[in-house]
C-alpha cells in the first residue's frame, strides 16, 4: 500500500499540478 502512495505522489501529483 505504501508503494501505491509513493507512485501516486511521484507520478499523479505532478501530472495534476502541471494541469493547473
Swiss-Prot record:
GO terms for molecular function: rRNA binding; tRNA binding. The keyword Cytoplasm does not apply. GO terms for cellular component: ribonucleoprotein complex; ribosome. The keyword rRNA-binding applies. Keywords: Ribonucleoprotein, Ribosomal protein, RNA-binding, rRNA-binding, tRNA-binding. Disulfide bonds: none annotated. This is one of the proteins that bind and probably mediate the attachment of the 5S RNA into the large ribosomal subunit, where it forms part of the central protuberance. In the 70S ribosome it contacts protein S13 of the 30S subunit (bridge B1b), connecting the two subunits; this bridge is implicated in subunit movement. Contacts the P site tRNA; the 5S rRNA and some of its associated proteins might help stabilize positioning of ribosome-bound tRNAs. Belongs to the universal ribosomal protein uL5 family. Under acid-stress, this protein is expressed at a higher level in wild-type B.cereus than in the acid-sensitive mutant strain NB1. Part of the 50S ribosomal subunit; part of the 5S rRNA/L5/L18/L25 subcomplex. Contacts the 5S rRNA and the P site tRNA. Forms a bridge to the 30S subunit in the 70S ribosome. This is Large ribosomal subunit protein uL5. It comes from Bacillus cereus.
